[in-house]
Amino acid sequence: MPALAVDAAAPVAHAFACDAARFPAPLLGPAAAAAAVAEKPDAAAWSADLSSALYNVDGWGAPYFFVNDDGDVAVRPHGAATLPGQEIDLAKVVAKAAGPRSGGGLGLPLPLLVRFPDVLRHRVEALNAAFDYAVRSTGYGGRYQGVYPVKCNQDRHVVEDIVEFGEPFRFGLEAGSKPELLLAMSCLAARGNPDALLICNGYKDDEYVSLALIARTMGLNTVIVLEQEEELDIVVDASRRLGVRPVVGMRAKLRTKHAGHFGSTSGEKGKFGLNAAQILSVVAKLKTLGMLDCLQLLHFHIGSQIPTTALLGDGVGEAAQIYCELARLGAAMRVIDVGGGLGIDYDGSHSAQTDMSVAYSLEEYAAAVVAAVGRVCDRKGVAHPIICSESGRALVSHHSVLVFEAFSASAPGRIDPATGYLLDELTDDCHADYRNLMAAAVRGDFDTCALYADQLKRRCADQFKDGVLGLEHLAAVDSLCEIVARGMGAAEPPRTYHINLSVFTSLPDMWAIGQMFPIIPIQRLGERPAVDGVLSDLTCDSDGKVDHFIGGRHSLPLHELPVHGTRGYYLGMFLGGAYQEALGGLHNLFGGPSVVRVSQSDGPHCFAVTRAAAGPSCADVLRSMQHEPEVMFEVLKQRTDGATAAALARAFGAMPYLSFDPEAAAMASGESSGMSSDSEGSAAGAAEEDDDEWEFMRGLTV
């Protein structure tokens, strides 16, 4: 587009101020002015309740998370039954965990994973209560007896807690691999209910099947679920060799299909399960072997995050029909395992429109399952079976919160008055575009402004590539166009907040499958969040960002960062207790977070930290990739003096994430080592510290 003649006087470049406040504003009508005021209310009029509504905390967080009167995110560890004196302020937990030891804190580096075992207990109790109510209210003749699929979160304390909390309900475990089976066997043997089910899923070899049969000899209620027809031969051979009669289940491949991205394992082309012909073949083989009484369980799975009870009812009804057919064929059927699929509401919409939510409650899910099984069994005249579910996501998602710090943010565009003259040095065609842009701005002509801003930027970029303009000219033009856009009322582009976190390690589902989790500030919620931001992690990867948020947002309302040296700006990622820890990788060798276990107590802050552990150190993550930190340290130490070697030892022992603790930074640089800068002092220090340098590093590793 050629430069147009200037039809209004425009000021010279350096007459403009550094921000949009000094830009000539367009005239606004009363309606537009009212809308602008509504969009940017006075910060004093803001409240914690408004923040709660803005982030829809009650939608996705109830009954566990809410915004308290102090403007902090708080936790109700016992759900709706939590008393006012039992609520836990998450910001106070972070202050305790990350605060310096000299001030009574634990000195743990961030990021920080906060576990709430009381929430886990409440989830176990709520799931069992929902099914118990559905059974009693409908006169169902069986009972509910669930299992926790350990793949959702294999952390020792999580699994042990679930078994302990579930013991009164005969709650068991599900394993899908040999290490998971060993984990489940030891945990159930130590603290489980003798009647608790141990469901063995996944592909199997002789060693896997032998472990499962050994578990039966230990008195564990073990069921080997056939995923493939040929697994039956392995089970029969192992049982004969060990002299153990197995209890067998089958996974059916249903026709019912779940269309969401969590439903790829459902339908006739699903990854797992036996079709109708294969089911009949297994029954025939068992009958020939005189082992048909060993077949006692039917399992199916139509996908995680089942969106509606209508789809759930279809799948359960189809499976119940197969269950009844197996009973008719002579199998000693007693359990129907409905698999996973009990979803949670990540975005708080309570709808089936996206994969981020479900259109039912826990109670409605249980009622739909019980009704579907009971209806089919009644029609077929088959005794009501034990109902089992593998509801991992619904159990563990709420129990942990990932807390991380935003340590810097990109600055909005500005023009330095000292460099504003650069705009007057543009070439003639660029300068004509510039003056036309200014004239349109004075008139309040938004469309023409946008046109000339785009043309000016493109023309200047071309001339920069040709070497006509310098980098300073390019920066001045970019800043000017950004300020003009803001002055014309255009939405300010989101600012990038840099976070002390690895998305690949702590939020793997977010970049891998587009899963969204609620992310909000955990404090300052009594203040209006005046900045729209996106999050960028520490990794050297363009995928290491968060720019999609619940509610369809492409930015997150945030606050201006605190002045350097004051308290940090902490964000929390919620509902991530399932899968994220197991799936996280070591991109750029960033390891996992520090972890604290927090229980409700009668203390002054209503909580007690019952377990704390710093995250993996640099040495730990290097070792996981087959490096030898001890050897690396010795090689490096040969080229350093004593003070530097001590700093190296501390670096090996520290977490890979950034540290903003001045004392820690001084220690790492050797400023607090007490070492002299002269060579004699350094040599003496090296001699004194030679024996304890590596021990100091080893003590810092987890």
From Swiss-Prot:
Expression by tissue: Expressed in roots, leaves and stems (at protein level).
Keywords noted in UniProt: Decarboxylase, Lyase, Magnesium, Putrescine biosynthesis, Pyridoxal phosphate, Spermidine biosynthesis
The name this protein goes by in its record: Arginine decarboxylase 1
The protein's annotated pathway: Amine and polyamine biosynthesis; agmatine biosynthesis; agmatine from L-arginine: step 1/1
Disordered: region residues: 668-702
Bias (Low complexity): 668-686
Gene name, Swiss-Prot/TrEMBL: ADC1
Single biological process term from Gene Ontology: response to cold
Pfam family, one: Orn_Arg_deC_N
The UniProt record lists the keyword Magnesium: yes
Alphabetical list of SUPFAM superfamilies matching this protein: Alanine racemase C-terminal domain-like, PLP-binding barrel
Binding-site residues, substrate: I336, D337, V338, G339, G340, G341, L342, G343, I344, D345, Y346
Biological classification of the source: Eukaryota, Viridiplantae, Streptophyta, Embryophyta, Tracheophyta
UniProt GO molecular function: arginine decarboxylase activity
Keyword Lyase: yes
Catalyzed reactions: L-arginine + H(+) = agmatine + CO2
